[in-house]
């Protein structure tokens, strides 16, 4: 039974540190305690534990734009975070978890602005069928968290830009994100800002549980442990190195012919590449494909390797430009 409420508000927008703090709070929560942790990430795509990042978002474009890719501990789908989004986490022991009660905190907080929200589908929270909060869960060795998003004034253009993968036929054993209609709460009530929603969440937390909440000070955290966690979440091995093999087919028709490039990828490395075309210039196509094998699945590296190989085969400049652009746009 919950008998102690604690709140903690992040002081950073670094997504790797925020996830490290979340993990730390979860594994240090006391029996009977529930911690409400509020945090924000700047320009970030967060994917589920078992997802294929290349399938869920435009990784190269996101990182070229200064964004961050983050893999969380919980399952579920990919989400976009910016400073128009407020994230929450309920940390507690597994035996104290009550999803309905936890979601009621969200519903109560939104209700304080005169909006009627309800739980829908797979633990989403929506208003008139439009989702503003997606939720996911994690538990390990009796420790548990329930976290989610609150869309306040998120840049939905960026959300669509980075979450929608290219039209290439990407096949994977990873978990697909479920695309839903979403709504920014500020569009329904101008009084909703990040600050007002934080206060509403803290007030609703105490109201729903019927207990006063005490804030947790940063000096009570083990900053060395959190830094180690941050390094792990930020590592390439954690972000990209999940063993989820997939095939990406790049295909495009040009004035000089149609091109298909099948890239078989495992642990961010190309294991096989098959390049084919109906072009009259097709003699060198099979050689080009083999030179991709063993390379990291990164746009910049593949473009350099492709351009170098095309030059060696004396491929006309217009065809070189078309093929390099295809790789840049579809990976």
Show the residue positions of the predicted features.
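N-terminal lobe of the biotin/lipoate ligase/transferase fold
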Residues: 1-97
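Short, glycine/charge-rich beta-strand/loop segments that flank catalytic centers
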Residues: 40-43, 119-129
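FAD-binding core of FAD-dependent oxidoreductases
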Residues: 72-87, 122-128, 136-143
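Contiguous, small/hydrophobic- and glycine-enriched helical/loop subdomains that border
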Residues: 85-123
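A generic structural motif
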Residues: 92-96, 186-191, 277-281
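Long, positively charged amphipathic alpha-helical accessory segments at protein N-termini or as interdomain linkers
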Residues: 106, 114, 133, 141-240, ...
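Short beta-strand elements
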Residues: 136-137, 149-152, 252, 259-277
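Structured beta-strand/loop patches that form or line metal/cofactor-binding pockets in enzymes
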Residues: 222-266
